[in-house]
């Protein structure tokens, strides 16, 4: 799998959403190998999108379409500065509680790990126990970048359920796992709370 993370500052979330809705309507049918996208804008105007493709080749074919270029030329004008693109083939998808497209709340976390391999190993442990402890989590997509950087997308049933889940006392084994994960972070991660997530999949 190949993922492209697009982010930047916007001043009109509704206009950006209309542009992406337009892409789904007009361009998605011709985007062979596109698997789905999660996007949204935080309350302070930070836009982020995570687009998934079957392969890097499929993503490049999409980017090279004239209609894609024309669409992005117009959409880029909605950003208050330059949008950044970060590509990755280091992708782990974990779906435990249904269809991520049904999520009522999405949180994107970006940071840097001192040991990405160990962090990925920890994320894959005790998935059944985590699913039982946090039924509000539908699934996640973990994306590794150069230099230990990462983007993690977590899909929740609702923000209310997510906040309630955060307050629950963890079983000791899961707490130890979380403590080790946090200790691997270099600096403080950035959180993007998408209270109205845009969830797109091929029709």
What are the roles of these predicted feature ranges?
Residues 1-48, 52-203:
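Short S/T/G/P-rich N-terminal loop/turn motif that feeds into the first structured element of a domain
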């Amino acid at each position: 799998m190949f993922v492209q993370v697009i982010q930047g500052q916007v001043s009109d979330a509704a206009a950006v959403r209309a542009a992406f809705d337009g892409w789904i309507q007009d361009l998605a049918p011709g985007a062979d190998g596109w698997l789905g996208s999660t996007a949204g804008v935080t309350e302070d105007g930070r836009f982020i999108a995570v687009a998934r493709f079957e392969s890097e080749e499929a993503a490049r074919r999409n980017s090279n379409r004239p209609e894609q270029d024309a669409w992005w030329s117009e959409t880029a004008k909605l950003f208050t500065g330059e949008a950044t693109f970060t590509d990755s083939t280091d992708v782990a998808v974990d779906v435990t509680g249904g269809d991520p497209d049904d999520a009522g709340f999405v949180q994107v976390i970006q940071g840097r790990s001192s040991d990405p391999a160990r962090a990925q190993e920890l994320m894959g442990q005790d998935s059944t126990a985590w699913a039982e402890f946090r039924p509000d989590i539908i699934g996640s997509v973990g994306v590794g970048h150069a230099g230990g950087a990462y983007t993690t997308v977590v899909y929740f049933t609702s923000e209310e359920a997510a906040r309630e889940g955060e307050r629950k006392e963890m079983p000791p084994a899961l707490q130890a796992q979380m403590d080790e994960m946090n200790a691997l972070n270099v600096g403080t991660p950035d959180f993007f709370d998408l209270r109205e997530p845009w969830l797109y999949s091929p029709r």
